[in-house]
Structures are given as C-alpha cells and as structure tokens.
C-alpha cells in the first residue's frame, strides 16, 4: 500500500502526493522560546522527526523548515522580569531546545528561520493584504478582517464563524479591531517594547502572520505538509489559511495539515498550575533520552498520550530489551569475525534454505519488516511499527542462542539482524544507541575495567549539560553530586568537560 496521510482539513487519510515528484516541502511550527522546552515539545518534534525519517527512508527528499517565534509577549515579559534584552531570553531557550532535541535523537530541520529575521517580508505581506482589502489599519495596528473571506472560516476545526468566543483570535491586544473575530497582523509597540519601523508606525508582528511569511519565503505560495500541535489548529493555523490564501489568491495553502496529540501527565493535562509540568531537562535527569523517545513513539502521533512513571518504567524495560538484542547480534558478528569466520553470507539468500530452522526464522523477521513498513505507510503508525520491531527483538536472541544452526549460519543471521534493527529501530524510529553501548549492554565484560562506568558517566554528563544550558542549576548540582559519589571528578574547561576517576 502506498503512503496514506491523514489530513486535518479533509478529515480523511489520503494517498500522499506532492507538488514535485520525489520532494516534500514540510513546515512545522516551532517553539516560542520564553522558557525551557517541555514534554509537549518533545512529543511534537519527535512525532515530526518520525515523519521526516520515514519520508527520507522511503526515498523522498525532504525540505524541512521549522521556525522560532523569537519575539512575543511572553518573551518580552520574561526579559522585563530578568532585566535583560528579549533576544537573550530567546537565544538561551533556543540553545536549550537544540540541546534537548539532540539528546532525544531528533534530526535537525534544514532551516530554522526566526521572526526577527523576516520582518521585511511580514511588512510586505501585511501591505498586500491591506491593498486587497483583507486587512485594515486601526489606531493600535493592523488587523485581518475575517468578514473579507468568511468561506475560509473553520476549515480545520469545522466550527461556525458565529461560534467563536470573543478574544479567541489573537495573542496581542484586541482594541481597535472592528470584529472580535479579527486578529492582529501588526501591533504598534508600547513604550520600551521592541519595535520595527513600518508604514503604520513602529511595532511588531502579530502571532499568526510570521508563519505565513516564512512559509511563503521558503516554499512559495503552496506547499506539501504543514504540521504542529493539535492546539494550533485554531486560531493559529486557520489564521494562516486566511492570510496566505487571501494574500496570494492560491488555494489550498497546504496539501496535508498534520497535527499531533496532547501530552497528559497521570491522566491530567500537563500544566504549571497543577504542578505536573515537566521540562525535558527535568525528565532527562530521571530517564534516558532514548527511553523517553521510546515511550512517546509507543502511541500514534495523532493520539493523546498519558505519560506516567509506570509508562516510562515500562518503556525503560522494553528499550533495554531492544538494545540488548542489538548488542547481542553485534557481539556475535564481532566474535565471528575475530574467530576467522569469513565470507559471512548476506541474507536473505537461497542457499540458507538448506537450514530449515534458520529459513523459517528468517521468514518471520522478513514478515515483521514488511508489516512494519505497512504500518508506517498507514499514516506513520509508530505504535504498530514499534510492536513489530519489539517482536523482532524478542526473536533475535532466541535464534542466536539456538543449537539448531552452525557457527557460519549464526554469523550470517547476526549480520542480518544488525541490519534489520538498524533499518527500522535505528534509521526510522531513532531508538538505537551507539554500537559500543549496545554491545556493553549485552556483555559488560567487553570492557570490565571502565566500560560500564564510562557509559553511565557520559550519560550523566549529557544530562548535566542539558540542565546547565537551561540554567537548571539545582538539577546540574544533583547530577554532579551523583558523579562525585561514584568517585568521578568533573572539571569544566573552555574546551569542554573533562572527567576522571578519583
């Protein structure tokens, strides 16, 4: 079955077809960097990383753009509270984001445009909307007129134009607009706020216009995929449809709208007021990054996911089994090569059928591989894919430890198992660690003096780096104390961290 993707706008799975054969233009709304990234961000960007990985594994060239909203009310408020420039707040939290995503094995997008870099393009787009009478100038800025294109209302959420509560359509102030459903395109700055010159006076962009301007700059008038969290469908993404389609006259703006589900904590929506709000840094102090990734991928990206300590502990056990299977196969290949087993046959191939046992088990793995690909082609179903991969991870050690196959066939199967796991658990799901780490999980005696300590220390240091980048000094100190208790001396230098055993 060819790839089918669920489109929020049409509310159905459709065969995936792009404007240009073999290429995908994908825009995903990025963070507003006023505070450290949290588990909701982890869910979102791991989901779109999965989509990115599968498209590339399927032969597509993906042109991936993800923005940073580096000017916003919350950033300004945080900067005022700290008495620093708003760009310092944004940059600090952008660094935190990159560090967290790297730890979670999220591949980088091709471009990360920032709002402050595209203000001229935003002003040009607002001017066009005014000229086409889709926007109007008021005493406090420029507003988009919903009444100028009522047919576009509710395209993603299905709600009626008359059903919107007052004030739902914009983050910035709402005085001066003609209709409560109108939203801000350009907001005149108050004294002391960041400001850019414009034909309507010094000010800054509204929330929604930025993404329309950035997608137009990078992809043109129409593109293939627009993604983001479920909460962005309204007002943000519906506002983008208004702005972009009214500006360019082209419809639809996007071929496929893709939205990921929410993250709940122990059955409740994650929120600071409920005290169940986790930053990624806080989560990685307690759980390995790939364990967290494993847990988040064990749900379809459109489904809500209820994170709990029980779920994360279960993911820890499942991920350990996966890594151990990978390590086991790697160890067998390495030991076979050292023992002089040469010309290890490349599976699958016809002459292996002389071993009925191996042929039957090989058939099971090939079937799982096919089923995993079918699941990914069914709207990127990572839950089903992960289930197939874990079935393989249970099967691989059983075959490698079997007495029914000889040394050469065992080596051949181990090599096939490594490639099998690397294809889906690694390239597609992004769940495999470095080879030496996996081998040590299976056989710690590979480096009895320092291997286990070295891996644990490096994992702790990586978590400490994340905490330090987010200025989470308490977590960083806790990790340093844990290292000290292990007899590890940590020294921070301009060239990086140096550690030694006391």
What kind of feature is each model-predicted range?
Residues 269, 279-502:
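Structural preference for alpha-helix termini/caps and helix-kink/transition segments
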Residues 10-15, 19-107, 492-499:
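N-terminal, positively charged nucleic-acid-binding surface of large information/translation enzymes
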Residues 68-73, 94-97, 107-122, 140-148:
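Short, glycine/charge-rich beta-strand/loop segments that flank catalytic centers
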Residues 60, 134, 488:
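Short phosphate-binding/catalytic loops that engage adenosine nucleotides
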Residues 80-86, 110-116, 229-230:
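The substrate-binding groove and active-site-proximal loops of carbohydrate-active enzymes
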